Amino acid sequence: MFKVRVIPCLDVKDGRVVKGVNFVGLRDAGDPVEAAIAYGAAGADELCFLDITATHENRGTILDVVKRTAEACFMPVTVGGGVRTVDDIRTLLNHGADKVSINSAAVSRREFVKEAAEKFGNQCIVVAIDAKRVARSGSDRWEIFTHGGRKETGIDAIEYAQEVVALGAGEILLTSMDRDGTKQGFDIPLTRAIADSITVPVIASGGVGNLDHLVAGIREGHATAVLAASIFHFGEFTVRQAKEHMARAGLPMRLDP
């Protein structure tokens, strides 16, 4: 049986962690490599870097972060943010990323997913979906939003997920824009609707406030992995506490001695 993955996410801007990471013993809470090493030691199954650098010219900083992290850590690393071309993907993989997450570029040009999967293999292509509940002609549905949730597309999230999987996406990183930052838990109906409609793993993201929310994302949302940021970054819970709690709830976890 597959093991459930717990994935901390670090937002990186100009080579620094935004909001910092509140771990005891970190020399520099703003250094993403320091944070990555700490998460690796804490038992994180994977790590996600989201590059939110405003300008494309500053991409060199995230490449340095990825390279140093790959040299220092043994867990898989996914990198997303501003990935627009096959060359962007190649460069990130060459610097040590295991997987690359694409978002807006896939929405605007679906063929990008197919090109990337054919060139690098679908196992390293993650499509990030930011979805929000929208009322249309009397009924609710989830739609895709881009540019950090600011730009609405009118695209149905479930249909889009099915489409990108058919084009070769190996994994879906699903964020509920309604829940993100609320600490009220994942949007379970959204997560389950997407997970049940496709054949590849779904990473649930957006809204984690306690450890039971992580369990619910898997058990009720049918996700295969959970991603969280602030509950780990600010020392509320450790990754190990999260994994032990999930194991006690009966979920199959990788627990290192």
UniProtKB/Swiss-Prot annotation:
SUPFAM superfamilies: Ribulose-phoshate binding barrel
List of catalytic residues: 11, 130
A Pfam match: His_biosynth
One Gene Ontology CC term in the entry: cytoplasm
Subunit note: Heterodimer of HisH and HisF.
Function: IGPS catalyzes the conversion of PRFAR and glutamine to IGP, AICAR and glutamate. The HisF subunit catalyzes the cyclization activity that produces IGP and AICAR from PRFAR using the ammonia provided by the HisH subunit.
UniProt name for this protein: Imidazole glycerol phosphate synthase subunit HisF
